[in-house]
Curated annotation (Swiss-Prot):
<feature type="binding site">
    <location>
        <position position="44"/>
    </location>
    <ligand>
        <name>pyruvate</name>
    </ligand>
</feature>
<dbReference type="InterPro" id="IPR013785">
    <property type="entry name" value="Aldolase_TIM"/>
</dbReference>
<keyword id="KW-0457">Lysine biosynthesis</keyword>
<dbReference type="GO" id="GO:0008840">
    <property type="term" value="F:4-hydroxy-tetrahydrodipicolinate synthase activity"/>
</dbReference>
<dbReference type="Pfam" id="PF00701">
    <property type="entry name" value="DHDPS"/>
</dbReference>
<keyword id="KW-0456">Lyase</keyword>
<dbReference type="InterPro" id="IPR020624">
    <property type="entry name" value="Schiff_base-form_aldolases_CS"/>
</dbReference>
<dbReference type="GO" id="GO:0005829">
    <property type="term" value="C:cytosol"/>
</dbReference>
<comment type="function">
    <text>Catalyzes the condensation of (S)-aspartate-beta-semialdehyde [(S)-ASA] and pyruvate to 4-hydroxy-tetrahydrodipicolinate (HTPA).</text>
</comment>
<comment type="similarity">
    <text>Belongs to the DapA family.</text>
</comment>
<feature type="active site" description="Schiff-base intermediate with substrate">
    <location>
        <position position="160"/>
    </location>
</feature>
<comment type="subunit">
    <text>Homotetramer; dimer of dimers.</text>
</comment>
<dbReference type="GO" id="GO:0019877">
    <property type="term" value="P:diaminopimelate biosynthetic process"/>
</dbReference>
<dbReference type="GO" id="GO:0009089">
    <property type="term" value="P:lysine biosynthetic process via diaminopimelate"/>
</dbReference>
<keyword id="KW-0028">Amino-acid biosynthesis</keyword>
<feature type="site" description="Part of a proton relay during catalysis">
    <location>
        <position position="43"/>
    </location>
</feature>
<dbReference type="InterPro" id="IPR002220">
    <property type="entry name" value="DapA-like"/>
</dbReference>
Amino acid sequence: MFKGSIVAIVTPFNNGQVDFEKLRELVEFQISNGTDAIVPCGTTGEASTLDYDEHMDVVKTVIEQVNKRVPVIAGTGSNSTAEAIELSQKAKEVGADGVLLVTPYYNKPTQEGLVRHYTAIADAVAIPQILYNVPGRTGVNMLPETVARLAPHKNIVAIKEATGSLQQASEILALCGDKIDVLCGDDFITFPMMACGAKGVISVLANIMPKTVAELTDAFYAGDMEKARQLHLQTLKIGNAMFIESNPIPVKTALGLMGKCSDEVRLPLCPMGAANKEKLAAIMKEYELI
Protein backbone atom coordinates (compact mmCIF):
# COMPACT_ATOMS: atom_id res chain seq x y z
CA MET A 1 0.00 0.00 0.00
CA PHE A 2 2.78 2.45 0.96
CA LYS A 3 6.09 2.03 -0.85
CA GLY A 4 9.21 3.73 -2.13
CA SER A 5 10.74 6.86 -0.63
CA ILE A 6 8.58 8.13 2.23
CA VAL A 7 9.91 11.23 3.97
CA ALA A 8 9.57 11.72 7.72
CA ILE A 9 9.24 15.46 7.26
CA VAL A 10 10.54 17.99 9.80
CA THR A 11 8.27 20.52 11.50
CA PRO A 12 9.84 23.95 10.88
CA PHE A 13 9.68 26.51 13.68
CA ASN A 14 10.14 30.27 13.80
CA ASN A 15 10.54 31.97 17.17
CA GLY A 16 8.86 29.09 18.96
CA GLN A 17 5.89 28.77 16.61
CA VAL A 18 5.25 26.31 13.79
CA ASP A 19 6.24 27.94 10.49
CA PHE A 20 3.40 26.76 8.27
CA GLU A 21 4.63 28.70 5.22
CA LYS A 22 7.98 26.89 5.34
CA LEU A 23 6.18 23.58 5.94
CA ARG A 24 4.23 24.07 2.71
CA GLU A 25 7.47 24.88 0.87
CA LEU A 26 9.10 21.72 2.23
CA VAL A 27 6.15 19.65 1.01
CA GLU A 28 6.61 21.10 -2.49
CA PHE A 29 10.36 20.40 -2.35
CA GLN A 30 9.56 16.76 -1.57
CA ILE A 31 6.90 16.21 -4.21
CA SER A 32 8.87 17.96 -6.95
CA ASN A 33 11.80 15.63 -6.26
CA GLY A 34 9.94 12.34 -6.50
CA THR A 35 9.04 11.51 -2.90
CA ASP A 36 6.35 8.81 -2.81
CA ALA A 37 4.62 9.69 0.50
CA ILE A 38 4.97 12.10 3.43
CA VAL A 39 4.89 11.45 7.18
CA PRO A 40 4.18 14.55 9.27
CA CYS A 41 4.49 14.43 13.07
CA GLY A 42 6.85 11.50 13.33
CA THR A 43 10.05 11.44 15.37
CA THR A 44 11.72 13.76 12.86
CA GLY A 45 8.68 16.06 13.03
CA GLU A 46 9.17 16.54 16.80
CA ALA A 47 5.68 15.23 17.54
CA SER A 48 6.53 14.78 21.22
CA THR A 49 6.87 18.55 21.71
CA LEU A 50 3.84 19.62 19.67
CA ASP A 51 0.63 20.25 21.57
CA TYR A 52 -2.58 18.64 20.33
CA ASP A 53 -3.73 21.63 18.25
CA GLU A 54 -0.29 22.11 16.68
CA HIS A 55 -0.08 18.39 15.92
CA MET A 56 -3.37 18.38 14.04
CA ASP A 57 -2.66 21.72 12.33
CA VAL A 58 0.62 20.30 10.97
CA VAL A 59 -1.18 17.19 9.70
CA LYS A 60 -3.95 19.27 8.12
CA THR A 61 -1.48 21.67 6.48
CA VAL A 62 0.48 18.82 4.90
CA ILE A 63 -2.74 17.16 3.67
CA GLU A 64 -3.95 20.45 2.17
CA GLN A 65 -0.64 21.20 0.47
CA VAL A 66 -0.20 17.67 -0.86
CA ASN A 67 -3.75 17.79 -2.27
CA LYS A 68 -3.87 14.04 -2.94
CA ARG A 69 -0.70 13.99 -5.08
CA VAL A 70 0.97 11.47 -2.75
CA PRO A 71 -0.24 9.64 0.37
CA VAL A 72 0.03 11.41 3.74
CA ILE A 73 0.68 9.17 6.74
CA ALA A 74 0.11 11.04 10.00
CA GLY A 75 2.20 10.25 13.04
CA THR A 76 -0.38 9.52 15.75
CA GLY A 77 1.49 7.28 18.18
CA SER A 78 1.42 7.78 21.93
CA ASN A 79 2.30 5.91 25.10
CA SER A 80 -1.37 6.34 26.01
CA THR A 81 -3.59 4.00 24.01
CA ALA A 82 -6.57 6.32 24.44
CA GLU A 83 -4.60 9.29 23.10
CA ALA A 84 -3.32 7.27 20.13
CA ILE A 85 -6.91 6.36 19.28
CA GLU A 86 -7.99 10.00 19.56
CA LEU A 87 -5.14 11.27 17.36
CA SER A 88 -5.71 8.51 14.79
CA GLN A 89 -9.43 9.21 14.61
CA LYS A 90 -8.79 12.92 14.12
CA ALA A 91 -6.18 12.21 11.44
CA LYS A 92 -8.73 10.08 9.61
CA GLU A 93 -11.32 12.87 9.85
CA VAL A 94 -8.97 15.45 8.32
CA GLY A 95 -8.10 13.18 5.40
CA ALA A 96 -4.90 11.28 6.23
CA ASP A 97 -4.29 8.20 4.08
CA GLY A 98 -2.79 6.27 6.97
CA VAL A 99 -1.26 6.63 10.42
CA LEU A 100 2.14 5.76 11.89
CA LEU A 101 2.01 4.42 15.44
CA VAL A 102 5.21 4.28 17.47
CA THR A 103 5.36 1.66 20.20
CA PRO A 104 4.45 3.12 23.60
CA TYR A 105 7.56 4.70 25.10
CA TYR A 106 8.70 5.11 28.72
CA ASN A 107 6.01 2.86 30.26
CA LYS A 108 7.65 -0.26 28.71
CA PRO A 109 4.68 -2.53 27.98
CA THR A 110 5.15 -6.28 27.67
CA GLN A 111 4.72 -7.99 24.30
CA GLU A 112 1.15 -8.83 25.34
CA GLY A 113 0.63 -5.16 26.18
CA LEU A 114 1.83 -4.18 22.71
CA VAL A 115 -0.63 -6.60 21.11
CA ARG A 116 -3.50 -5.18 23.15
CA HIS A 117 -2.43 -1.57 22.49
CA TYR A 118 -2.29 -1.96 18.72
CA THR A 119 -5.37 -4.15 18.55
CA ALA A 120 -7.36 -1.53 20.47
CA ILE A 121 -6.32 1.18 18.00
CA ALA A 122 -6.93 -1.00 14.94
CA ASP A 123 -10.37 -2.00 16.24
CA ALA A 124 -11.31 1.61 17.02
CA VAL A 125 -10.16 3.44 13.87
CA ALA A 126 -10.71 2.15 10.32
CA ILE A 127 -7.63 3.61 8.66
CA PRO A 128 -4.47 1.90 7.33
CA GLN A 129 -2.03 1.66 10.23
CA ILE A 130 1.75 1.31 10.26
CA LEU A 131 3.36 -0.11 13.38
CA TYR A 132 6.63 1.63 14.30
CA ASN A 133 9.37 -0.21 16.16
CA VAL A 134 12.29 1.97 17.28
CA PRO A 135 13.61 0.48 20.55
CA GLY A 136 16.59 2.84 20.65
CA ARG A 137 14.14 5.66 21.42
CA THR A 138 11.25 3.89 23.15
CA GLY A 139 12.85 1.37 25.48
CA VAL A 140 10.78 -1.53 24.12
CA ASN A 141 11.48 -3.86 21.19
CA MET A 142 8.45 -5.30 19.43
CA LEU A 143 9.51 -8.84 18.60
CA PRO A 144 8.84 -10.49 15.23
CA GLU A 145 6.45 -12.96 16.89
CA THR A 146 4.43 -10.03 18.22
CA VAL A 147 4.26 -8.44 14.78
CA ALA A 148 3.05 -11.78 13.42
CA ARG A 149 0.18 -11.76 15.93
CA LEU A 150 -0.89 -8.29 14.77
CA ALA A 151 -0.33 -8.74 11.02
CA PRO A 152 -3.69 -10.43 10.24
CA HIS A 153 -5.71 -7.38 11.41
CA LYS A 154 -7.20 -5.75 8.33
CA ASN A 155 -6.31 -2.23 9.45
CA ILE A 156 -2.65 -3.03 10.23
CA VAL A 157 -0.89 -2.83 6.87
CA ALA A 158 2.82 -2.31 7.56
CA ILE A 159 5.59 -1.93 10.10
CA LYS A 160 8.36 0.66 10.12
CA GLU A 161 11.21 -1.47 11.40
CA ALA A 162 13.93 0.73 12.92
CA THR A 163 16.03 -1.59 15.05
CA GLY A 164 18.81 -1.33 12.48
CA SER A 165 18.81 -5.13 12.44
CA LEU A 166 18.53 -6.96 9.13
CA GLN A 167 18.05 -10.14 11.13
CA GLN A 168 14.97 -8.79 12.89
CA ALA A 169 13.53 -7.41 9.64
CA SER A 170 14.16 -10.74 7.93
CA GLU A 171 12.44 -12.64 10.74
CA ILE A 172 9.37 -10.40 10.41
CA LEU A 173 9.29 -10.99 6.65
CA ALA A 174 9.72 -14.74 7.12
CA LEU A 175 7.02 -15.00 9.80
CA CYS A 176 4.45 -12.67 8.23
CA GLY A 177 4.80 -13.29 4.51
CA ASP A 178 2.41 -11.02 2.62
CA LYS A 179 0.20 -10.32 5.66
CA ILE A 180 2.11 -7.11 6.42
CA ASP A 181 4.51 -4.83 4.53
CA VAL A 182 7.88 -3.94 6.03
CA LEU A 183 9.28 -0.43 5.62
CA CYS A 184 12.89 0.34 6.50
CA GLY A 185 13.28 2.83 9.34
CA ASP A 186 17.03 3.41 8.98
CA ASP A 187 18.48 5.14 5.91
CA PHE A 188 21.78 3.28 6.16
CA ILE A 189 20.15 -0.09 5.37
CA THR A 190 17.40 0.87 2.91
CA PHE A 191 18.90 -1.11 0.03
CA PRO A 192 19.79 -4.26 2.01
CA MET A 193 16.39 -4.29 3.70
CA MET A 194 14.61 -3.89 0.37
CA ALA A 195 16.71 -6.80 -0.91
CA CYS A 196 15.21 -8.84 1.95
CA GLY A 197 11.68 -7.79 0.97
CA ALA A 198 10.99 -4.35 2.46
CA LYS A 199 8.77 -2.13 0.30
CA GLY A 200 10.65 1.13 0.88
CA VAL A 201 11.96 3.49 3.54
CA ILE A 202 10.56 6.08 5.91
CA SER A 203 13.52 8.39 5.56
CA VAL A 204 15.24 11.17 7.48
CA LEU A 205 17.80 11.73 4.72
CA ALA A 206 15.03 12.44 2.18
CA ASN A 207 14.45 15.78 3.94
CA ILE A 208 17.66 17.08 2.34
CA MET A 209 18.20 14.61 -0.55
CA PRO A 210 14.71 13.64 -1.70
CA LYS A 211 15.70 13.05 -5.32
CA THR A 212 18.54 10.69 -4.38
CA VAL A 213 16.50 8.60 -1.94
CA ALA A 214 13.68 8.35 -4.49
CA GLU A 215 16.18 7.34 -7.18
CA LEU A 216 17.46 4.55 -4.93
CA THR A 217 14.03 3.04 -4.32
CA ASP A 218 12.98 3.63 -7.95
CA ALA A 219 16.12 1.86 -9.18
CA PHE A 220 15.33 -1.10 -6.94
CA TYR A 221 11.79 -1.37 -8.29
CA ALA A 222 13.08 -1.03 -11.86
CA GLY A 223 15.39 -3.98 -11.26
CA ASP A 224 18.55 -1.86 -11.56
CA MET A 225 20.30 -3.36 -8.54
CA GLU A 226 23.69 -1.95 -9.46
CA LYS A 227 22.38 1.63 -9.47
CA ALA A 228 20.53 1.03 -6.18
CA ARG A 229 23.69 -0.46 -4.65
CA GLN A 230 25.83 2.46 -5.79
CA LEU A 231 23.35 5.01 -4.38
CA HIS A 232 23.28 3.04 -1.12
CA LEU A 233 27.06 3.27 -0.80
CA GLN A 234 27.23 6.89 -1.97
CA THR A 235 24.73 8.09 0.64
CA LEU A 236 26.18 6.27 3.66
CA LYS A 237 28.37 9.16 4.80
CA ILE A 238 25.69 11.86 4.60
CA GLY A 239 23.10 9.46 6.01
CA ASN A 240 25.29 8.76 9.03
CA ALA A 241 25.80 12.51 9.47
CA MET A 242 22.06 12.84 10.11
CA PHE A 243 22.67 11.09 13.44
CA ILE A 244 25.80 12.76 14.82
CA GLU A 245 23.41 14.27 17.38
CA SER A 246 19.85 13.30 18.27
CA ASN A 247 17.43 13.32 15.32
CA PRO A 248 16.15 15.80 14.13
CA ILE A 249 18.91 18.18 15.26
CA PRO A 250 21.30 17.33 12.37
CA VAL A 251 18.69 17.26 9.61
CA LYS A 252 17.22 20.58 10.77
CA THR A 253 20.71 22.05 10.94
CA ALA A 254 21.28 20.81 7.40
CA LEU A 255 18.02 22.33 6.16
CA GLY A 256 19.06 25.59 7.82
CA LEU A 257 22.42 25.52 6.03
CA MET A 258 20.54 24.91 2.76
CA GLY A 259 18.23 27.88 3.42
CA LYS A 260 15.13 25.68 3.41
CA CYS A 261 13.92 26.55 6.93
CA SER A 262 15.19 27.59 10.34
CA ASP A 263 17.31 25.08 12.24
CA GLU A 264 15.24 25.78 15.36
CA VAL A 265 14.28 22.81 17.54
CA ARG A 266 12.21 22.69 20.72
CA LEU A 267 13.59 21.97 24.16
CA PRO A 268 14.73 19.58 25.46
CA LEU A 269 16.45 19.38 22.05
CA CYS A 270 18.92 22.19 21.52
CA PRO A 271 20.99 23.63 18.67
CA MET A 272 23.87 21.55 17.33
CA GLY A 273 27.28 22.10 18.90
CA ALA A 274 29.76 24.17 16.89
CA ALA A 275 32.20 21.30 16.24
CA ASN A 276 29.49 18.99 14.92
CA LYS A 277 27.96 21.77 12.84
CA GLU A 278 31.34 22.35 11.20
CA LYS A 279 31.68 18.61 10.55
CA LEU A 280 28.16 18.42 9.09
CA ALA A 281 28.75 21.44 6.84
CA ALA A 282 31.96 19.89 5.50
CA ILE A 283 30.15 16.67 4.61
CA MET A 284 27.30 18.61 2.98
CA LYS A 285 29.85 20.46 0.82
CA GLU A 286 31.22 17.09 -0.34
CA TYR A 287 27.70 16.26 -1.55
CA GLU A 288 27.27 19.74 -3.08
CA LEU A 289 24.25 20.43 -0.89
CA ILE A 290 25.67 23.81 0.13
